[in-house]
Regions:
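Short, small/polar residue-rich loop motifs at catalytic or cofactor-binding pockets
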Residues: 113-116, 274-276
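Glyoxalase I/VOC metalloenzyme domain signal
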Residues: 1-21, 25-48, 58-107, 122-214, ...
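Active-site/pore-lining binding-face segments in mid-to-C-terminal subdomains
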Residues: 110
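Short, Lys/Arg-rich nucleic-acid/phosphate-binding segment
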Residues: 50-53, 116
Length: 295
């Protein structure tokens, strides 16, 4: 049972996010196998092969860089990345990727979070990937979350936020599209979900970077944060691996670095050091982070 709940204001605003995700860097056990999976399953294209990594993304931008160096696949009892979410800008593209995954025989879990539609899958090392279509316009308000997730849509219907998507209905939006086409150019890193040792210190840390608290479920060991609007699930964290877990070993597959882009002046934070035009540090999950501005 969920013991305590804190929910920030969930009013949807037209304000631009203060922060967005830049390039995400992952360490894998077999670089060639990983590149083959990410390109075949998701339709990412190779943008750069400068040693030692391979940059993958859309025709417009790099989303991830895969690095060799991991010796063992993902193991659960450590902090680090829980999953990486890649966002689609349209229902048609989301549905087309679902069709692609099915055609490629990739195991996938289509899930309706109400605020978003999501497709969950894993790469060969066990890294979890989420393909998401953000749908904040479907969400109205939270119910009594002390007894489990209860989300109300704009028609007043309650949802668990964890139900299955209607696959047939989703695929209808991809009718006539080529599932084997590359990912649309406007694909983007939608959010990162971390495994952390404790919620409160991690929430405090990310607040100094410009994120704001949204939903905190202490009894469920989960919290998420926004960065302005319209989506309030720009960063998530959990303690499901257990409290006070150590960071992932250096030889394990996982997230090794990510960029955050500030849309405006950089926030003053004691947790990152200045390095030329950027700020660098290590987050509460033990992952290297670079914060830069787009101005």
């Amino acid at each position: 049972m969920l013991k305590s709940v804190a929910v920030a204001d969930t009013t949807i605003s037209a304000q631009r996010d203060r922060l967005s995700w830049g390039v995400v860097e992952l360490q894998v056990t077999d670089l060639d196998r990983a590149v083959a999976f990410w390109t075949s399953a998701l339709g990412l294209i190779v943008r750069d092969t400068a040693a030692p990594g391979v940059a993958l993304g859309t025709r417009v931008r790099t989303l991830i860089v895969l690095h060799p160096g991991a010796v063992v696949p993902v193991k659960a009892p450590f902090t680090g990345m829980y999953h990486l979410a890649i966002g689609m800008r349209s229902q048609a593209e989301f549905s087309r990727l679902l069709a692609r995954l099915i055609q490629r025989n990739v195991p996938v879990a289509p899930t309706d979070h109400l605020m978003a539609k999501s497709l969950y899958l894993h790469d060969p090392d066990g890294l979890e990937i989420e393909i998401t279509l953000e749908t904040p316009e479907r969400f109205s308000h939270f119910g009594d979350m002390s007894r489990g997730p209860r989300l109300y849509d704009v028609d007043g219907i309650v949802h668990s936020g964890r139900g299955p998507l209607d696959v047939r209905a989703e695929l209808s939006h991809a009718a006539g599209a080529d599932p084997m086409a590359p990912m649309a150019g406007d694909g983007y890193v939608a959010h990162l979900h971390f495994k952390v040792a404790a919620l409160e210190p991690a929430l405090n840390w990310f607040e100094t970077l410009g994120f704001e608290r949204h939903l905190t479920l202490d009894g469920w060991g989960f919290a998420d944060m926004g960065a302005g609007a319209p989506n309030t699930h720009r960063l998530a964290m959990n303690t499901w691996a257990g409290p006070n877990r150590p960071p992932m070993p250096q030889d394990m597959a996982g997230l090794v670095h990510y960029e955050l882009i500030a849309h405006g002046d950089l926030a003053a934070t004691p947790h990152l050091r200045q390095d030329g035009d950027v700020r660098r540090g290590t987050d509460p999950a033990g992952v290297a982070v670079t914060l830069r501005t787009d101005i």
